[in-house]
Amino acid sequence: MVHVAWLGKKSPFCGNVSYGNSTTKELKDRGHKVSFIHFDNPSNSNAKNPLFLANDPEVSLPYLIKSQVYTIPSPRAEKELKISLERLKPDIVHASLTLSPLDFRLPELCNQINLPLVGTFHPAFDIKNRNLTANTQQLTYQLYAPSLGKFNRIIVFSETQKKILAKLGVNKEKQIVIPNGVDENIWEPLIEKNKKHDAVRKKLGDGRIFLYMGRIANEKNIEPLLRSWRKTKTYNCKLVIVGDGPMKPTLENSFSNLSEDKLIWWGAEMDLETRVAIMQIAEVFFLPSLVEGLSLSLLEAMATGTACVATDTGADGEVLDNGAGIVISTDNVSTQLKTIIPILIEHPAFTKALGEKARDRVIERYTLKKNIDAIEKVYIELKNSFKN
């Protein structure tokens, strides 16, 4: 068994939080020891030592500012991280990037205490750099590449992402392609109605449900979806927006003329069972992002048998290729959706067939078991090589 010190996020909720929670839970279920290190105790606390107990699997580091995207650590965070790692004595340090400017110090810090360092590199990308958001994300890759080259292994989600990092100088031999995975036994089509399902359905009301679930940020490109929905005749159909983020107040204000029988702003949803129930009830899931990595929300929707429409950015187009969903370009999203949405509304049998193909694709390629099998292999190889 392997003892992993996991550097990740617990809050605010985002894809990185989902990735860390699902991966570490599965590792623990397989008998591995996981110590979760994250930014949690505010820097203005009076604590002089890391929030660490000998029998506590979690370590909290101080921060100045924390958001869905990035955290600014307290000046003493690096010292506290080093002290924690020296006490924990893990076999592996695994960082779920990006977290904070402390990311760039990890290779040197782990080298000082002779610990192998693995990173999962989440930032979204678009190989074609078709917009300003994609160009901004490319800068993130350029900024991180020199540091990533000093990690012992870097986990990426697709061959395309691997090529981008290789062009920036990150050794291909250090990069391991391990796509995201979801638990198909949790994210599954509704088999039998339950209290959670009934409660969610009551809140949503009658009608067919079309869904976006994720961060409400500029790069998620939700506005074209809302514009298209507003201009489409959607009798007995509702668009539900689940999530939170910096663009939410602006978009809510811009589309305040849409009544609740056409558009529902659900807000952030932390409860797993509720998120599963929403996905199960939804007929179609939209992901109109300008840039992506490999969206966990997309995989979760596919696993529940929900028909999916996503842009061809990051690895999402690859996930839905050959009929597992509808792939659109990041160019003129609104125009494409104005054509697609009426078809999906008028042909429920088509959405049902798409949903079935989507779940088949997840079972074939993107289960959590396959993901953890591959991560375990990386851990064991590194642990053995450091022993020798």
Region spans (language model):
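Short hydrophobic beta-strand element within catalytic cores of glycosyltransferases
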Residues: 307-310
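Conserved donor-binding/catalytic core segment of Leloir-type glycosyltransferases
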Residues: 5, 204-229
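Aromatic "clamp/platform" in nucleotide-sugar-dependent glycosyltransferases that forms part
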Residues: 290
